[in-house]
Amino acid sequence: MRLRRTLLTLALAAAVFGAAASAQTPADRVDPFIGTTNFGTANPGAVTPHGMMSVVPFNVMGSEENVYDKDARWWSTPYEYHNKFFTGFAHGALSGVGCPELGALLTMATTGPLTVDYREYGTSYTAEKASPGYYSVFLDKYGVLAEATATARSSAERYTFPEGTGHILLNLGEGLTNESGAMVRRVSATEIEGTKLLGTFCYNAQKVFPVYFVLRVSKTPSAGGYWKKQRKMTGVEAEWTPDNGRYKLYTEYGRELSGDDVGYWFSFDGLAAGEQVEVRMGISYVSTENARKNLDAEQAADAPFDAIREQARKGWNEALGRIRVEGGAEQQQRVFYTALYHALLHPNLVSDVNGEYPLMERSGETGVTDGERYTVFSLWDTCRNLHQLLTLVYPDRQREMLRSMTGMYEEWGWLPKWELYGRETFTMEGDPAIPVIVDSWMKGLRDFDVAKAYEAMRKSATTPGAQNRMRPDIDPYIEKGYIPLGFYAKDLAGDTSVSHALEYYMADAALSLLADSLGQGDDARLFRARSLGYKRYYSPESGTLRPLHPDGTFLSPFDPKAGENFTAAPGFHEGSAWNYTFYVPHDVEGLAKLMGGRRKFIDKLQMVFDEGLYDPANEPDIAYAYLFSRFRGEEWRTQRETRRLLERYFTTAPDGIPGNDDTGTMSAWAVFTMLGLYPDCPGEPYYTLTSPTFDRAEIDTERGTLVIEKHGEGYIDRMTLGDKPLKNYRILHDDLLKGGKLTFELQTGK
């Protein structure tokens, strides 16, 4: 647990660590404040592994003291480490995303005269603490200690008040989401229920969905009621309306209330100093009835707050404890377990305790599963490493995610791309469900409907563009082998044709592997041939991949550095040609031949790192450091660059993630790299090896415990798998698990 703004002397820190190190659990090594600035968009809120519910401090509105304000700029997280103004706890949030969504259902504790305007009731705060499944903060204006914990589908908050009158507020008008509209209904003096509309993620105005809630307070209030922001009127109407343009308190109204800016308040008179009021909330994306079922099933009426908190912590220790590391610096262990923590947040549950969930793209209709249904499939990001991590260490969860994806196809007709609570947002490009499913299949996860999955993949890889929701620009891709400039975006500054094509090449390479595994030889050859179309983009003149016009000529003039720092670059999405040129993980040797051979490939790739052209926060080049190891004698470069990247970009500071965590993708890179292996080609059942960070790691897998040991420091001299020497730096998943123990012998020289 971390106490922000508290200074410890080095001597005290050393003494405490020395005494407690042996007793530390994995959860003790997690710092939820890592990644909460530098646009990492992580947050320190309370959540369980893959939980539907998260309880997140909301500090991005209401005060000029804040460095960042959600209403003053594009902003995609409910919490920023450097902000100072707290306006409540949000219930349900996304971690590591680039567009604003969720972060609503804001609860707040206040004292003194009642006010429901967040600009007035917000407060500075101190003494933040966060650990897996728990968050607390002291609200300066009110002298209130606010604490939060969570179960999979519900939350618990505990507010410790000073003497006097206290209030609990539920603000349904504000939040991170850009959507508006809510309803709240009084059920009893201590319980309310309702719904809030969410959606419009990443410019998708029609992709909206409701969240339902039931909220209970532990103490009977002395008063309670609704509020609503009144519309601004002029003239005579304004003269007759005392609440014109302001928040109106409804003290004599007891039925439901709807509107864009509504809420509910509970007041408690005569509180003793130190008296506590607890708030419990259940949520559902199906119905209010299910929100109540979720709350009742996961929290007994008399369950103490501390028991719920301890259960959340236990769940995290069980999940994090599937990987146990020894050695390395204390800070490295903290980086590792925090990265693993972030990698276990999304995808998250969307099914309720009764198995019900919102059907994919069938608004208002409900499905039922006898397992678990998952949501938040940010697949352009997570197809590269996060699902591979789940396959290796958490296969049961990955199976449910595979079933969730194939279920979406059965309900909607397409696999997901960037799915969010039953809505497809089409964010980013490519056909990223294919490499995820293929990768799992090739690594032995086969108890899902692979025939249905293959049908879905083949559909998106062959359907003409006018009818193709996954690949609307597939026609020239099939006819020409590439996507020309101007086909997808007439404005060349917004054209991302090369990026689109590269994603399709990778997906088709993976699909060819599955086709071959299923005995579909003709399909295997077809999709493999398509995956090599990237060669048409290679320009000997620039030495990079380069956008093509419809007539097959290269874009000119052309600057391969254009696109750095998210500036526009024709053909490329959020990056430069250098961020994409080596993004052919399924044919690295073929790309090297195009470049003039191994030596030129290595020199050019090394130049990308040496001249700062590598973007550690961008997915297409995320595996670049591992490409050196495809060539014998160059493996030391992989070890050097991965070590440098870890040391520079992954730290224990609040900015200790290199930009947006992308629902755990950057964190999954760190987890794999610190263990000494990485899945450098999505869909292929291989890992590329590098020097591990830790002296020993034990990883629980379906086939037993995989042990990774490191002896010495520096560069790899020898490796053994089991009791046999290992010469190849690329190893099959099956061989790794069969071997059981991977040992690295390091020496100081290369």
Residue ranges of each PLM-predicted region?
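Sec/Tat signal peptide C-region and signal peptidase I cleavage site
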Residues: 19-23
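ATP-dependent phospho-/nucleotidyl transfer catalytic cores
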Residues: 507
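Accessory carbohydrate-recognition regions in carbohydrate-active enzymes
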Residues: 24-383, 387, 391-435, 441-502, ...
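Bacterial N-terminal signal peptides
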Residues: 9-18
